[in-house]
Structures are given as structure tokens and as C-alpha cells.
Amino acid sequence: MGKEIVESAILSSVLVLVGLAVGFLLLKVQGE
């Protein structure tokens, strides 16, 4: 039970990090 919660938390945090990285790259590309 606890393992599933940990895995979903890790997945969501990874998705958030990926989203932030993509957004940052898009802003950087648009700024140039």
C-alpha cells in the first residue's frame, strides 16, 4: 500500500520537474 503511494509521488514529482525544464527551455528559445 505504502509503496504505491511512494511510486506515485515520485512519478508526479518527476513529471513536475520535466514540465519545469520544458517550460524553461521554451522561454529561453523564445527569448533569443
From Swiss-Prot:
GO terms for molecular function: electron transfer activity. The chain crosses the membrane at residues 9-29. It is a single-pass membrane protein. It is found in: Plastid, Chloroplast thylakoid membrane. It holds the Pfam family PetM. GO terms for cellular component: chloroplast thylakoid membrane; cytochrome b6f complex. The keyword Kinase does not apply. One of its GO terms (biological process) is photosynthesis. Keywords: Chloroplast, Electron transport, Membrane, Photosynthesis, Plastid, Thylakoid, Transmembrane, Transmembrane helix, Transport. SUPFAM superfamilies: PetM subunit of the cytochrome b6f complex (SSF103441). It comes from the Eukaryota. Component of the cytochrome b6-f complex, which mediates electron transfer between photosystem II (PSII) and photosystem I (PSI), cyclic electron flow around PSI, and state transitions. The 4 large subunits of the cytochrome b6-f complex are cytochrome b6, subunit IV (17 kDa polypeptide, PetD), cytochrome f and the Rieske protein, while the 4 small subunits are PetG, PetL, PetM and PetN. The complex functions as a dimer. Belongs to the PetM family. This is Cytochrome b6-f complex subunit 7. The lineage of its organism: Eukaryota, Rhodophyta, Bangiophyceae, Bangiales, Bangiaceae. The gene is petM.
